[in-house]
Amino acid sequence: LVLIAGNLRAVGVLEENLNKISPWHTDVPLLGGLVAMVGGFKAVIFGDASFHRLVYTYDWWAPSRALSILPGQRNTVTPITEFPFWTFLFADLHAHLYAIPFSMTAAGVGLGVVLNFSRLNPAGAAGEHVRAREISSWAMVFVLALIVGALRWINSWDYPPFLLLSAAALIIGERAKEGRFTLRALSIGVMKSAVMGVLSYALFANIASNYSQAYSSVERSDQTTALGDYLSHFGILLFLITGFVLFNLNRTITRTNWVRTMFFGGARRRQPLQTLPVMAALVTAAATMIWAGTFERWGVIALGGVGLIAVILVAARELRSPTPTAPVLLFVYAMLALGLGLSAGVEMFTLEGDVGRMNTVFKFYLHVWMIWGVVAAFGLWYLFAVMRPQEAFLRRAGAINASIVQAPRYAFAAIALLLLALALVYPYFGTRARIHNRFDPSLASTNDGLAFMNSTNIRPESSGHDNVYSAHYDATGVNGEHELRYTRDGINWIREHVQGTPTIMEANGPSYRSLGNRVAIYTGNPAVSGWQFHQEQQRVKFGAAVGARAGKRHGGASRR
C-alpha cells in the first residue's frame, strides 16, 4: 500500500480510455463509469479495439495531478499528487525520492521505541535487566535523532512531520513503560523528545552552519482542495482506515457492542462513555463535512475534524487500557492523526514563495500517503487477523446465523479486495505506458541508460524568449541538429580516461527537457549551472548570481 498501490485517479484515466472505445454509455449517476469500463473491455476482448493501444495511450502522468483548480481561485498552478510508485517510475532523482526510505525508517524506529519501552513495563519485563533496557531506550533516542536529523538535510520537508511522529513515539513509549498514562510519563516523554530534537540539530551542526535556507515562512493559501479530488487520491487508503477506526470507535462509545458482535462475534459488555452525546457530536461533524464538501471549499478540513474527533475517542480508550497492545494502537492513531493534520494544514497554509501551493501539497501529501499506507495495512491485518470471530460464538450461532452476523464483515472484505485490485491499475498500465514513452520505443528492455543516444537527436525549438533544445526520435539521423551518438562517445571517453571530478562546461539549457546537462548527468561530474528555473527557485537569495552564471540577459532571454 505504501510503495506499490496507485490512486483512484489512475482508475479514472483508464475509465476515460475505455469510454472512448465503449459501445455502451449511460448518464445514470455512478453507473456511467462502470458501464463504460465494461463496454470498453468488451470492445477490447470481442471487438476491434486494440489492447496494445489501450495500454500505450494510457496517460501515466495524469494521476500525479489528481487535484483540480476550483472556480474563482487566483492561482491556476495544479498541485502535484505523487505517490511512491509514481515517484520511482518517473525516476527523477529529487530529494523527496531519496527521503522515502529514511522517512519509513524513522516510522519503523518509532514503532521500535514503543515496543522497546513496553518491555520496560514491570509487568512485561519477564526477568530482563530493567537498567539495561533503560539504557537501550536512551540509545533509541539517539538513533531517532540521527535518522530524523538526516531527513532535514536529505529533504527538509520531511523533517517537521517525522520529528513530530518520533516525539509521539517517545511519549507513547513512556506511557507503555508506566503501564498507564500519567503526568510523570508525559513529562519524561516530552523531555526525551526535546533531547531528540536538540540532538537532531547538533549531529548535523556542521551542515547547518554552512547552509542558507531560501524559504522559511508560510502564508495563507488561496487554494483549497475539492473533497472529491482528495478522495480520488487517498480514497483507497481512507476506506481501509475507516473500517479499522469504526470498529474500534464502536468498542469505545457503545454500551453494547452490537457492531463487534455482528462483525466478529465478540461478547457484549458495557463501556463507561455515554453513547448519545458522542454519537450526536459525530453526526453533527459528519453533516458539517458533507455540507462543506458541497461548496468544495472546506470539505477536507471538515473531514480532518471528524477524523480527529474519532481518533481522540479511540485513543482515549487505549490511554486507559492496561493491555499490551494499547501502546501500538496509540502509535497507529498518532500516525493517523498526523496525516489528518497535514491534510488540513495545506488547506490553510502554504510555503511562502511556492509556485501556488504546488510543492506544499506535493511534499505533505506524499508524507500522508506513506504514513496512511502503513496505517491502512495495519488496520486491514488487525480486523481480519487479530479480531477474528470467536469459534465458540460461531458454534452457538449455527451456520445460518453465523453467516448472517458476519455479512457486514464479508461485505467490507469484498469492497476492500476490489479497492486493492483497483490500486494495481496504475502499477500495470502506468508502468507499461511509461516504458513506452521514451525517445526510441523500438528499443528492447535494457539497463543501459545511454542506449537511447544511439538513435536520438536534439534540435532547437522556439519556447517563449528562449531557444530550447528538445530531444526527439529520428531513426534516419538526418533531420536532427545534433546526433546524440557522438555525445555518447564523448561521455564514454570521459568515464574511461578522466580522473577525479573536474567541472563540466556545457551549453546551458533553461528547460529540464533540453538535456542541457547531459554530459554532467551521465558522467557524475559537477556542472557550472543546471536547469535555470530550478537553480533560481532553489537559490532565491542568490537569484542574480545564478542568472549571471547561466548567461541570462535582462529581459528574460538567454545568451548562447
Please provide the spans of the model-predicted regions.
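Signature aromatic-anchored transmembrane alpha helix within multi-pass, membrane-resident enzymes
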Residues: 1, 138, 189-201, 277-285, ...
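Aromatic-rich transmembrane-lumenal/periplasmic boundary elements in polytopic membrane proteins
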Residues: 2-89, 211, 215, 429-443
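Membrane-helix boundary/interfacial segments in multi-pass membrane proteins
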Residues: 85, 90-92, 96, 213-233, ...
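Membrane-interface alpha helices of multi-pass inner-membrane proteins
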Residues: 87-90, 141-154, 286-287
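Hydrophobic/aromatic-rich transmembrane helices and adjacent perimembrane loops
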Residues: 100, 162, 358-382
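Perimembrane helix-loop-helix junctions
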Residues: 110-136, 162-197, 214-225, 241-258, ...
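Membrane-interfacial loop-to-transmembrane alpha-helix junctions, especially the N-terminal start
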Residues: 129-141, 184-197, 256-282, 299-303, ...
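Extracytoplasmic
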Residues: 427-560
